[in-house]
Amino acid sequence: MDSDATLKQTNVDDIVRKSADDAAETLADGDTRLGFLKKAGLAGGAVVGGGALIGALTPAGAIAKGKGRPPASFGKGDVGILNFALTLEYLEAAFYNEATANQKKSKFIKDGQTQVFLKTVTTDENAHVAFLKKALGSKAIAAPKVDFGSTTSSEASFVKTAVALENTGVHAYSGQALNIASPAYIAAALSIWSIEARHASVAGLLLTGKPSGITPDGPFDTPFTAAEVLKAVKKTGFLQ
């Protein structure tokens, strides 16, 4: 790696670390008792096929400021929103980690671009989890138990599920952006949201092979309320 590339990466690392530190400082006061994921209605459901999954995660209506917040079981205020985001990041990271393990065992992904996507996004999603956990500190919610079925061992199912999960992440972050009070939290959320959008675009292109896969919902993103996100995630059956 040349010196310019090293410098750029160092700058990015410093920005990420600073955002996480700033966000963590906003949690210094008060305490939050977190409920279990089941209280949020996340557990249960059956694993569905890629087409049905994508259909379940299509955008709903836009939301206004102060509406569509996560259930109280995630925590109060900004803590609840970041724990809501962390739950989605846990899900995504676990999905890609399992797919990576299966890829090492069976080489189920044959397409070279999809292999690169898996490697890159696995790193990113684990970084997002670490980032949010550091920002939340002792208030971070625990990782849920998951079951991805065959979606992490079939190339076609993997790509379809990646499209669904990444687009849901984008809709979830945009849905909560106006609900965040702390500037440090807004910076943290936006730094992840933009990367999730890039993941979704690449996954969509891998799935369709057409430019339309990059922006499946058109030129504007439609925010999801927390309830819409949780309903869509529950339908996947991935969270146990």
Language model segments and positions:
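Short, glycine/alanine-rich hydrophobic alpha-helices that insert into or span membranes
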Residues: 46-56
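N-terminal secretory signal peptides and thylakoid transit peptides that target proteins
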Residues: 25-48
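All-alpha RGS (Regulator of G-protein Signaling) helical domain and cognate RGS-like helical scaffolds
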Residues: 2-32, 55-240
